[in-house]
Amino acid sequence: MAMTIDVRVVSAEGSIYAGVADMVVAPGEMGELGILPRHAPLLTGLRPGELRIIHGAETEYLFVNGGILEIQPDMVTVLADSAERATDIDEAKALAAKQAAEARMAGHTDQMEYAAAQAELLEQIARLKTVQRLREQGFVR
């Protein structure tokens, strides 16, 4: 019997995913993390990006906007700042938000506003990259 790992993805909005996986790929702060059953315990931050939950031939694509990742040998828990199924991303809305953030940054407002616009820009770029990957996989037109 193949080994699996329990996966829970939750955000302030509620539970996004609960199930088992053969492998989880998460956007860690220092780069992508590939997590298999019996992984060493780890607690790390997440950056905005694509979370892939692989079970057999099926892959579940989620988008997380930062958060905390806890890994135990038999369980992965994602406490996301916000999360959504990647297929639910509104590409036009993400592109408009990206352009608005770029405009705010170009306006050279104060340092706090610039940092907030930069964070928004990075989030929207990550959303658009997730949509692009889904398009390449044939999930989005």
From Swiss-Prot:
Gene3D superfamilies: ATP synthase delta/epsilon subunit, C-terminal domain (1.20.5.440), F0F1 ATP synthase delta/epsilon subunit, N-terminal (2.60.15.10). It is a peripheral membrane protein. The keyword Transcription regulation does not apply. GO terms for cellular component: plasma membrane; proton-transporting ATP synthase complex. The keyword Cell membrane applies. SUPFAM superfamilies: Epsilon subunit of F1F0-ATP synthase C-terminal domain, Epsilon subunit of F1F0-ATP synthase N-terminal domain. CDD domains: F1-ATPase_delta. Keywords: ATP synthesis, Cell inner membrane, Cell membrane, CF(1), Hydrogen ion transport, Ion transport, Membrane, Transport. It is found in: Cell inner membrane. NCBIfam families: ATP_synt_epsi (TIGR01216), PRK00571.1-4 (NF001847). Belongs to the ATPase epsilon chain family. Produces ATP from ADP in the presence of a proton gradient across the membrane. F-type ATPases have 2 components, CF(1) - the catalytic core - and CF(0) - the membrane proton channel. CF(1) has five subunits: alpha(3), beta(3), gamma(1), delta(1), epsilon(1). CF(0) has three main subunits: a, b and c. This is ATP synthase epsilon chain. It comes from Acidithiobacillus ferridurans. The gene is atpC.
